[in-house]
Amino acid sequence: GLVGSEMCIRDRYRLKFEELFYVQLNILRYAKDRQRRYRGYIFEKVGDVFNTFYTKKLPFQLTGAQKRVLKEIRNDVGSGRQMNRLLQGDVGSGKTLVALMSMLLALDNGYQACMMAPTEILANQHCETIKELLFGMDIRVELLTGSIKGKRREAILTGLLTGDVKILIGTHAVIEDTVNFSSLGFVVIDEQHRFGVAQRARLWSKNIQPPHVLVMTATPIPRTLAMTLYGDLDVSVIDELPPGRKPIATVHQFDNRRESLYRSVRKQIEEGRQVYIVYPLIKESEKIDLKNLEEGYQHILEEFPECTVCKVHGKMKAAEKDEQMQLFISGKAQIMVATTVIEVGVNVPNASVMIIE
């Protein structure tokens, strides 16, 4: 009898293997087919813009990982096929810098570049960061979000058509029909899972040929899953932090240690740091979750009467949410109590602790 059951296990294993093998094979076939169908713009040269930035403007030495990823991107954009690459790296690993340098390659070859972020706050932050990095170089960078209207919007749209605007940064607003480029060659999409494939395709349709696409995410995605989810994307990983960045420590504590936890939070705030407190949506109903957040918020107000506490959750109106976020970003509020809506990424370099209830 034993032999029979062992055979059975092996047969099942074989069938499972075969099924997965064919899934992977199909994905690969799809990717190869895609590469044949979509020709990309060829960026032949590394020119003045890139070189000036590299020699004069780099805020710090690139890490080995950043150099490796840049090389992968340069190979892609010089190959004649359209690049579709997923760039994954922890918060603080320097993805934005790699994205910016890739965009400069497009500029060197006579194309425009565009960066799309999931929220206005994030788009604003990217725009400020990039303008700061390019300060003193003659490159017109513009921000386009839903709240930019009227004459200002018209001026940006005209600038895109004439080719004066070299880099456009924005939210979903950049894929509206009214937005047209003179020659869009490179697109960066931040936090992929907020944008569907259809939305990526809408950016391509703004051109005769599809631009090169770089997708950035801080969410670690296992390679096999990446293939299945984004079968059309090649994956690059930035797996080292810039010098001087401390790795992030994750600690699990039980409820009875709350007092000592709050003590260490106080210490951080006294040192001028800021703190996130996150109530993830675990319960089934949003009502209960909101109640948890509200109770947590009241509790934190009582615990930290000396602090300004702001709160953010998914049920708020966008304007209200932005106002609360601004309090935290500007440093006026020391503590932010939030649901997981903040996961899309806000850059608050001064925040040093995140407590997840």
Could you describe each region identified by the protein language model?
Residues 15, 19-22, 68, 72, ...:
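Amphipathic alpha-helical interaction segments
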Residues 1-4, 9, 64-69, 75-78, ...:
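Glycine-rich phosphate/oxyanion-binding loops and their immediately adjacent helices
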Residues 11, 64, 287-291:
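Ordered, soluble secondary-structure elements with a strong preference for glycine-centered loop motifs
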Residues 10-16, 57-60, 117, 121, ...:
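Generic amphipathic alpha-helical segments used as scaffolds and interaction surfaces in large
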Residues 19, 65, 260:
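Charged catalytic carboxylate motif
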Residues 41-86:
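Conserved pre-motif I regulatory segment
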Residues 5-6, 10-57:
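Upstream accessory/linker segments immediately N-terminal to the RecA-like ATPase cores of bacterial MutS
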Residues 82-357:
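Inter-lobe coupling/hinge segments of SF2-like helicase ATPases
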